[in-house]
Structure formats: structure tokens, C-alpha cells
Design a protein with these regions (language model features):
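Polybasic, Ser/Thr-rich amphipathic helices
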Residues: 183-188
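TRAFAC-class small GTPase G-domain
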Residues: 1-182
Length: 188
């Protein structure tokens, strides 16, 4: 009797200030939809998506959309520890959301292992005329925080899939690395 090795369910957490477009980013990736007007997320929402990788493997991800308001941070912090990856989103048209990135990175580092794959995403690049944060500023912030940087538009869908493709590959490799270390510890 053969047993098929199943990939685990990878949990990816979306973090960032309120109104940066986390829910739109979430819906664009999960359902390929965009709503111009929507209510702010209260607490958390999650959905599971099966993703086919370039090499033909399929994996399941559970994407968690979190509330960005300060009053919900205690609730969302409980989910940090079980995350395999974190996408930290800011709005390129709102400088304050960019300036808060360091606070988010500090929270992430306090709550999760340094082994959790984290990426920084500048959203709303479709609104070029109102842009307040340059791509170079986003790249500099990511470099300072030691994480990768991407830009996207949840509205148009631009660059959403490449962000997830890169993140999922890094998460799988990271998961294998961490598990190999655990295996070595338990067997030494």
C-alpha cells in the first residue's frame, strides 16, 4: 500500500494599516474580483485556495485577511505564531501607511520566528497621479527590514500572481528547511 505524501496547508497572513487594500488584495487573489467600495474587515476572514506550482505540484494556502485597526491588533496577534508567511501591505498613495511599516515589522518580529517568510507590498500602483511613496522608497524600506519588496494593484490585478508565486515557493523551501532542522534535532 502506498501512501501519498501531502503538502501541508500553508497559512499566509495579510497585515497592514486600515484601508491599504488588504481585503481587495485578498479578493483579487482568491476570487479574481475587485469591489470599489467595501466595509472594513472586522477581526479576521480566511479562505483556502489550491495553487498549482510551475513544477506541477499543487499546494493549499489559507489566506488570512486581518483588520488593520489598532483595536483589533490583540486579536490578530494570536494568528501570527501559526503563520508560515506574512504579506505586509502599505498604500503607495498614503505616506503614513508606509511610515507605519517599521511598527508592523517590529510587531512581527516580537510575535513570530525569524524563519517566517515576510514580504512588503506597496499596493495601489494604478493610482500613479496620487502616488506619495516611490518604488525606490519601498525597496529601501524592505532592504532596511531585511525582506523582499513588491508592488501591485489589487484593482487591476497587476503583479498579484507573481507576488504569491514567489512567496509560496519561498515558504515551501523555508518549511522544508525548518522541518529538516527539527528532524536533525529530534534524531541527534
Amino acid at each position: 500500500m502506498t501512501t501519498e505524501k501531502k503538502e501541508p496547508l500553508y497559512k499566509i497572513l495579510l497585515l497592514g494599516d486600515s484601508s491599504v487594500g488588504k481585503t481587495c488584495f485578498f479578493m483579487r487573489y482568491i476570487e479574481n474580483t475587485f469591489q470599489e467600495i467595501h466595509m472594513s474587515t472586522i477581526g479576521l476572514e480566511s479562505k483556502i485556495k489550491t495553487v498549482e506550482l510551475d513544477d506541477g505540484r499543487t499546494v493549499k494556502i489559507q489566506l488570512w485577511d486581518t483588520a488593520g485597526q489598532e483595536r483589533f491588533h490583540t486579536i490578530t496577534k494570536n494568528y501570527y505564531k501559526t503563520a508560515h508567511a506574512i504579506i505586509l501591505i502599505f498604500d503607495v498613495t498614503e505616506k503614513a501607511t508606509y511610515q507605519n511599516v517599521k511598527n508592523w515589522v517590529e510587531q512581527i518580529r516580537e510575535e513570530v520566528s525569524s524563519k517566517v517568510v515576510t514580504v512588503l507590498v506597496g499596493n495601489k500602483i494604478d493610482d500613479e497621479e496620487n502616488r506619495k511613496v516611490t518604488k525606490e522608497e519601498g525597496e529601501a524600506m524592505a532592504k532596511e527590514c531585511g525582506i523582499s519588496y513588491f508592488e501591485c494593484s489589487a484593482k487591476t490585478g497587476e503583479n498579484i500572481d507573481p507576488i504569491f508565486n514567489d512567496l509560496i515557493k519561498k515558504t515551501i523551501e523555508n518549511y522544508k528547511f525548518v522541518n529538516s532542522k527539527i528532524y536533525i534535532i529530534f534524531n541527534s
